[in-house]
Amino acid sequence: MKKFFQEFKADIKFKSAGPGQKLKESVGEKAHKEKPNQPAPRPPRQGPTNEAQMAAAAALARLEQKQSRAWGPTSQDTIRNQVRKELQAEATVSGSPEAPGTNVVSEPREEGSAHLAVPGVYFTCPLTGATLRKDQRDACIKEAILLHFSTDPVAASIMKIYTFNKDQDRVKLGVDTIAKYLDNIHLHPEEEKYRKIKLQNKVFQERINCLEGTHEFFEAIGFQKVLLPAQDQEDPEEFYVLSETTLAQPQSLERHKEQLLAAEPVRAKLDRQRRVFQPSPLASQFELPGDFFNLTAEEIKREQRLRSEAVERLSVLRTKAMREKEEQRGLRKYNYTLLRVRLPDGCLLQGTFYARERLGAVYGFVREALQSDWLPFELLASGGQKLSEDENLALNECGLVPSALLTFSWDMAVLEDIKAAGAEPDSILKPELLSAIEKLL
């Protein structure tokens, strides 16, 4: 390979050196021999840049490793052809410079624009059912948890522990320590020392006192703060002491412990904003708000300009590491994705998803809208490419960001069985969805 590039460079230098000259020939003789109307020599062709040479060398090295087991030498033409085939194969796999499922996405617009495919990204509070903007999530959930103390203080304190404290490792350590306290009381109800927890204890201070919601939890399950005399000091110390009433109901402590260990942070749920549209030639056109992108407006414009150069990039020799780095950069550009599913009757089902959400969520979303939700079906990306059967794949890994138009297809074998039995599948979507069908603008 090194010899190939050395010969390539030498050939360029030789051709750019100009006409030959004899050693004994003078400059005057040379000028006399030249034709007076001879056109000016063309400028020498510029050689490949260092980056292009390095990338070419890396690609050729990969081919050399693959071909090292073959008999006989490999010609330079064969190497070039093999590199060209490899690049063409990569382009075929990817389908195009864009992912197979993506469609035309214009520049992001501000929320409130009349032609946005969705007005923005919204969430639903799991406690109140309120629809929230992204910047309203945390404040609304905290307020709902605090209001929940009036109806269920135990559940509210547990939600506060998991939700108000962001360091989940510290939360787990604190929760496990509280569970240990409750286990000791449950296993040794006759031991008075287990019914008292010293607040100034080092373990309590480092693992429990630093967490929001822990004091509310102790008080909600029956502990009371009491000042008790301390050994070898005049001033009393503060303890949590379990009340006699709670001690008489050990099963309640066990239930509260299990509830504490099984809890999770309260998170706002992404609002799918499910909509159904009439058949439209604009199905693949998406006007997305800025919330869908993890980029500034300037960065998005630059990405769109670079997208037009994708074909040219495919013709440049790149190492595998370079390609993987570009792919990973692309996966991090988007937070959300808007998907449309074209049904056999031409109607469109639309929903919003996280970019890193699993493919199974899309199948579940479509199945919930079907009148015959028990029938198997397939989803096809643009070009008729069937989506992966691995429902654990993330949507950005499937190229379905920041938007995509999918095609719905019944399982043909099952559909033929239904028709053979003299039946026809019911209307695809549920009646309540069809009653709210819209025109896509």
UniProtKB/Swiss-Prot annotation:
Residue numbers spanned by region Disordered? 13-79, 87-106
Species, as recorded: Homo sapiens (Human)
Q: Where is the composition biased (Low complexity)?
A: 52-61
Name the Gene Ontology molecular function terms of this record. ATPase binding
Q: Where is the PUB domain?
A: 175-244
The UniProt annotation puts the region (VCP/p97-interacting motif (VIM)) at 51-63
Quaternary context: Interacts with VCP through the PUB domain (via C-terminus) and VIM motif (via N-terminus); the interaction is direct. Forms a ternary complex with CAV1 and VCP. Interacts with SYVN1. Interacts with HERPUD1. Interacts with VCPKMT. May interact with DERL1. Interacts with PLAA, VCP and YOD1; may form a complex involved in macroautophagy. Interacts with LMAN1.
Region feature (Mediates interaction with LMAN1)? 1-10
- Any single biological process term in GO: macroautophagy
Q: Where is the UBX domain?
A: 332-408
Q: What is one cellular component GO term in this UniProt entry?
A: cytosol
> Matching InterPro entries, A to Z?
PUB-like_dom_sf (IPR036339), PUB_domain (IPR018997), Ubiquitin-like_domsf (IPR029071), UBX_dom (IPR001012), UBXN6_PUB (IPR042774)
User: What SUPFAM superfamilies does the record tag this protein with?
Assistant: PUG domain-like, Ubiquitin-like
- Recorded protein name is UBX domain-containing protein 6
Annotated membrane topology: Peripheral membrane protein
